[in-house]
Amino acid sequence: MANKFTRQQISEFREQFSVYDKNGDGHITTEEFGAVMRSLGLNLTQAELQEEINDSDLDGDGTINFTEFLCAMAKDTYSEKDLKKDFRLFDIDKNGFISAAEMRYVRTILRWKQTDEEIDEIIKAADVDGDGQINYREFARLMMAKNQGHDTKYDTTGGTLERDLAAGVAKNIIAAPMTDFIKNLFEALFS
């Protein structure tokens, strides 16, 4: 189901779009998308980059325009493959955990406006085992809880990852670009 965006959200999405649209021509190419991913330490192959672009390229021109970007932002379901990609995006040092410092780094690169305190709140909300960082299971549980309409600020422990993923598959999950995941994570925790 597509979301109806507020003017503020559209403005924020336009700013996010400009992070990727380096030359300002109104289209995100695989090269531009790849440059942002590499700046975050994620070295996707050309085929993976093209697949990410194709997931949102509604008119088939090989790029993502702002309207297509908004459509991608409106998607609210994800696949396990996308969960893993997004987890890798945040896990800068590739140690299997997302720290507050890594989340702040991604925030800086993608020009998000969350404060350090809000980042700490995200970590605390997702950190089920209390070790001060987010492992993959905690990340997936947080995203699946958000996906199923739970209040992710307080409900991150309900169910198992396997059950949550099975529920998602049963709903015919539609693959969404990783920027969609990350943006929705921040919006879900602070809306």
Swiss-Prot record:
The lineage of its organism: Eukaryota, Viridiplantae, Streptophyta, Embryophyta, Tracheophyta. The gene is CML10. PROSITE patterns: EF_HAND_1, EF_HAND_2. Ca(2+) 1 binds at residues 21, 23, 25, 27, 32. Ca(2+) 3 binds at residues 91, 93, 95, 102. Signal peptide: none annotated. One of its GO terms (biological process) is cellular response to oxidative stress. Belongs to the calmodulin family. Potential calcium sensor. This is Calmodulin-like protein 10. InterPro entries: CALM/Myosin/TropC-like, EF-hand-dom_pair, EF_Hand_1_Ca_BS, EF_hand_dom.
